[in-house]
């Protein structure tokens, strides 16, 4: 193989987790998609983030990153889902450092640029429960947020203003989880 091709392949492998669109104002992470079970958006979001980090480190599949298992372990009847504090604890018990914070647009951009997907809580309506999604990308030129929405599909394009409204209604709750070994 010619040296130029080898350099190109090595470069592509080095950035495979963070993909930049042709437009420098947009970026997205190739976060695996997991479809949720009933009331299972939290479990599916945890599974997506854990599977993403497994891919980044070339680790084999881990049963602790399966949404059905996470749902069985963490489901709370009173919450009709999973409590945010239990999501954080699950990550910590499985070798992750976690940070929960009231996020801003700049936080999403900074973490995505570093190859770190985020879990965000959204409140789609006044009577609907919280809904957890994985923020996997941004398209600033088109003012879109790219979500892995476990109730819908991978890379769902949501208008930034709608995302901000639903995120604000949920207190802008944001969870960052990174493997302890990576310290990314």
Residue ranges and their predicted role:
Residues 45, 102-105, 124-126, 137-139, ...:
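A mature extracytoplasmic/lumenal domain signature
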Residues 2-8, 15-80, 124, 141, ...:
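Active-site-adjacent structural segments surrounding the nucleophilic cysteine of cysteine proteases
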Residues 8-10, 176:
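Serine/threonine-rich, low-complexity intrinsically disordered segments
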Residues 71-118:
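Mid-length scaffold segments of soluble, non-membrane domains
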Residues 40, 44-48, 69, 82, ...:
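Extracytoplasmic/secreted proteins, especially bacterial periplasmic and envelope-associated proteins
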Residues 22, 79, 113, 117, ...:
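Noncatalytic regulatory segments and standalone regulatory/sensor domains
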Residues 128-133:
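Short, surface-exposed coil-to-beta transition loops
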């Amino acid at each position: 193989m010619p040296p130029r091709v080898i350099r190109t392949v090595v470069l592509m492998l080095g950035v495979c987790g963070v993909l930049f669109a042709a437009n420098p104002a947009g970026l997205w992470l190739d976060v695996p998609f997991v479809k949720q079970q009933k009331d299972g958006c939290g479990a599916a979001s945890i599974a997506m983030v854990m599977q993403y980090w497994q891919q980044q480190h070339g680790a084999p599949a881990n049963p602790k990153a399966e949404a059905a298992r996470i749902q069985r372990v963490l489901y709370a009847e009173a919450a009709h889902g999973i409590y945010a504090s239990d999501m954080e604890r699950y990550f910590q018990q499985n070798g992750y450092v976690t940070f929960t914070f009231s996020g801003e647009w700049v936080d999403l951009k900074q973490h995505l640029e570093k190859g770190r997907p985020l879990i965000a809580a959204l409140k789609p309506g006044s009577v609907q429960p919280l809904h957890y999604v994985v923020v996997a990308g941004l398209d600033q030129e088109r003012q879109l947020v790219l979500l892995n929405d476990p109730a819908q599909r991978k890379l769902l394009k949501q208008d930034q203003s709608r995302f901000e409204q639903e995120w604000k209604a949920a207190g802008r709750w944001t969870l960052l989880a990174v493997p302890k070994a990576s310290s990314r």
